[in-house]
Amino acid sequence: LQIVNTSATSNVGDISFDGFYATRSKKDINAGFNIQFEDITAEKVIELMPAVDTLMPILKSFYGRLNCELAATTQLDTNMNLIIPSIKGIMRITGDDLYIKDNKMFKTLARKLLFKNKKEGYIEHMSVEGIISDSTVEIFPFIMKMDRYTMALSGIQNLDMSFRYHMSLIRSPFLFKLGVDVTGDDFENWKFKIGKPKYKNADIPVFSSVIDETKINL
């Protein structure tokens, strides 16, 4: 079964979808899809596709309108649920005029790094890309401006909810550049360490071509 060029428009955002479904037996079910959400809230993305919460758990702390793309192949169980460890694919998330709040990690880091607003962070623009494989999401480097800071971020989000992220403060009120490494078993149990920045300026590697090539090869 193959579905192509399917789209829908609603008051919660626009959705487009391409996909296929193939089965050799009840225990061997495969699917592939490219789903794109435009001008939609993070809450609705997770509601429509709960697997996104596993791929990028911090997304539920973002408020505002997002554009999201998830292209992947996966195995399905007999109830037609995604078998998370089998997912291989790419993800893209972009958005403007976003807020991150109701997030324990943000509040702790905002306090330690002397943010002006320690309750919520305003993000003028965000563009995140990553590759999903072997039960991990590799988040490629991206630039994000928040409060008085310009940050370069990258990391690994494991599908068991553990993670390892790095944040380089390439522009800040401090007289020297800092790096912050954040690791944890989940977003309730984590720790951070201040050290050297991995990225020195906003001229970070761009991996969009890798994302596009991976998407074509799915």
Residue ranges and their predicted role:
Residues I132-R148, A152-S154, N158-D160:
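Extended serine/threonine-enriched, polar tracts that run as long, contiguous segments within proteins
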